Amino acid sequence: MCSFNLKTSILLVGLTSLALAAPHKRATCDRVLLVEAADAYLDTIRSGNVSTLTPILASNWTYTENNKVIDATTGVIAKSLVIDHSRTNYDYAQCATYTELISASDASKPFVIGSQIRHNDDGKVNSIDIIASTTNSWLFNATKTLSYVVQERWDTIPEGKRDKREAIQAAGDAYMDMWSNATAHQAVPWGTPCTRLEGSAYTGKGAADDSCQPGIPSNHNQKPNTHRRYVIDEEMGSVSIFCIWEHMMNAADSHEFRLEDGKLRYVHTMTECGGKPCKL
């Protein structure tokens, strides 16, 4: 089982409370600020030099990797990775971003990573929260994941067709509740076509009737997915949810959902089990 200490638990409770709090726009939070921080983070991933982040960091910032608070210089952020794909979503209400990145071309350091970056009221980064999947992670194959991701279209949704952030989060929560709630699947706004990328396993076949429903849980008495942290981007119809995947070795988990016209279109998942092979 993955270890999960009290200090980490307290921090994640705080992050969850922050994510669920009534959102408010900070005077200093705009796209320029969020893009600058996301770009600096990606530059750090490439270089492996964590000190380059210093100008944008709050004095009390925390680095969380796979649900554990650690020294950033010992984490994946310091490994100097080749970035073959990245996409960043922007949550102005929470002054936060979510970045999906894939490093597949260096076979010695394959990773698929999700990152939530949060800013304080002064605009400084006070939290970098990462789910880093790699060898032994659930259904992991960075090369296959990359091949599927580049086929998808994550265009900005026209303003008049965007779902409200509450609806986007509710869709993600309903999906995440299916393991512990027998009726949760009824609240998921299933769309067609819809494709799920679970690690490197893809439900899409390029057909109009592609569905995200194959393989959803039939056992609803499993442990819940807890300590959820959210980044919501209405322009992309997306919610990123980080959590503890309790029924699979207390794994560190990332689920991202995209809604189009109120219906589920894409699901991306990453699940990491403390360096051990993930097993149900």
Give residue ranges: language-model regions.
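Fungal secretory targeting signals
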Residues: 1-27
